[in-house]
Amino acid sequence: MIKKTIKKIIRALGFDLTRYNHNSSESARISQFFSIYRINTILDVGANTGQYALWLLESGYKGRIISFEPLSKAYNHLIINSKKDPNWIIAPRMAIGNEEGKKTINISGNSVFSSILKMTETHIKGAPDSAYIDSEEIYINKLDNIRETFLKNEDNIFIKIDVQGYELEVLEGAINTLPKIKGIQIELSLVHLYEGQSLYHNMLGYIINLGFELYDILPVFRDKKSRRLLQFDGIFFRSL
């Protein structure tokens, strides 16, 4: 009776109370994958203010994290958050892609949706607060050009890619780095949310051809009205 009453109170506040299950916990599954593959270095591409790295640290991850972020405002917050762990390294402010030079990035009202690519109406309808409100010039480089600065031969590397439609370009600029990488977490879109982006079916084939296998799927972004899934994270690892 007491348990039911507590559940009702919690649900009235907009939350739910469930028994912890390591099989249904995203952080627990990621931690298990990291343990199996002995991951000790994570490339956090598209770090924003460090949300992913903070989540990893809260989940018990103890290895190195190397974060990359192009937006100046988000980068400043990222620097502050990184002081919470001595193994969290912040690269110079830059975007990661398949070229070296300068680009213009569009800044979203919700900065996590900012992108080099133009946003589609589908995205804006799905999340009205995501519309672009500004832009800034940024530096862009390839992982292949900078890997020796950050990576060691003994590293067991996992790369997380959250770049709002620019995922293929990141992989194309890391062709010589990818053979050293054990696993990938990458945001994949079911519909065109950014103009010119590659959709999930093309990305799945591309990543599998690189020698990875799909291990898990994490829902990421839904249309607020229809609840249709628009984006998910694919978790890939090389075969053991």
Named regions from a protein language model:
Residues 1-240:
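Phosphate/nucleotide-binding beta-alpha loop and adjacent structural elements of enzyme active sites
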